Regions:
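Beta-strand-turn-beta hairpins that frame and shape the catalytic cleft
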Residues: 2-10, 114-122, 219-220, 231-235
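Core catalytic region of metal-dependent phosphoesterases/phosphodiesterases
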Residues: 2-8, 12, 17-116
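C-terminal regulatory/interaction regions
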Residues: 265-271
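Active-site-proximal loop/helix segment associated with metal-binding centers of metalloenzymes
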Residues: 126-189
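Short, solvent-exposed loop/turn segments at secondary-structure junctions
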Residues: 16-17, 53-54, 92, 128-129, ...
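N-terminal short leaders/motifs
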Residues: 54-77, 176-206
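Conserved beta-sheet core of the metallophosphoesterase superfamily
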Residues: 104-109, 122, 127, 133-143, ...
């Protein structure tokens, strides 16, 4: 797929709508909807790269209440013919077919490659990739297990959602609200994952979320495969979040930039 002149592809992640409370979430939702409205005129495609919600469980006949402004804007963009893709994150992995049926938005449960304007993108939320974090990887297998999803699904929605929201609040209280810190190339698991992929094939842009840091990192070539398809250095892009940074990536057919809707470009980590 090649972009038409003056058209762009946008990438966003980690809205965590629903957290930390209704008032703060609603304010953030309005900002996100404003941004989506402003890009409608030149968006050729939009990728939502996980953790749109702080928690989401989709019952067969019931979905969580709220988020009507966001859903309305996504429906408007989708109905206007703009393709939208959604990758589940660790906070909203329990999605079924609501997005596909109601919004015509496909849902992906694992990283996926796309090619645009002869550039190769590997896109995913980023949770559970790379070495380490074995406890979470085991937990993810449990959460993705159909039997576990069924057991949660037989709880009445008022009980299930109440329990999930309580655990989400407790998790935030335990982890605190301090900013994440870049650990360096050797300790960032997603950079290690990118390097491993580049040993096998060429990728121009790795697009992930999950880390809650805005990162634009040029990866060192590790082999004859360790560059992008055009021979340039591959780049690992982490999309940050819409809690502190309001960051997003945009691709114009030639160049990809990591930007902030709130002017927080000075917070972007680059090498």
């Amino acid at each position: 797929m090649n972009l038409l002149p003056n058209k762009k592809i946008y990438f966003l992640s980690d809205f965590h709508l629903g957290a930390p409370n209704h008032a703060a979430s609603l304010e953030r939702e309005k900002i996100i909807v404003q941004f989506l409205g402003e890009i409608k005129h030149d968006a050729a495609e939009i990728f939502l790269v996980g953790d749109m919600f702080d928690f989401w469980y989709e019952y067969r006949q019931v979905v969580p209440k709220g988020y009507v402004r966001l859903f309305g804007k996504l429906a408007e963009l989708s109905d206007a013919g703009i393709p939208i893709h959604f990758f589940v994150g660790n906070h909203d992995m329990w999605m079924r077919d609501y997005f596909q049926k109601e919004l015509n938005i496909p849902v992906y449960y694992a990283p996926k490659e796309f090619e645009r304007n002869e550039k190769k993108f590997l896109i995913g939320h980023g949770d559970g990739l790379g070495p380490g974090d074995h406890g979470y990887k085991r937990l993810k297998k449990i959460f993705r297990n159909p039997a576990c999803q069924w057991l949660f699904g037989i709880l009445p929605p008022v009980v299930g959602m109440g329990l999930a929201n309580y655990l989400s609040r407790r998790s935030r209280a335990q982890t605190g609200s301090s900013e994440e810190i870049f650990l360096g190339e050797e300790k960032e698991w997603l950079i290690t994952y990118c390097k491993d992929v580049l040993q096998q094939r060429s990728i121009d842009f790795f697009i992930f979320g999950h880390r809650h840091l805005a990162i634009d990192y040029r990866l060192p070539p590790l082999s004859s495969q360790g560059r992008g398809a055009g021979g340039e250095a591959s780049r690992y892009i982490n999309l940050g979040d819409w809690i502190r940074y309001y960051t997003y990536a945009v691709f114009d057919g030639k160049n990809l930039e990591l930007k902030s809707f709130k002017g927080n470009e000075n917070k972007i980590i680059r090498n």
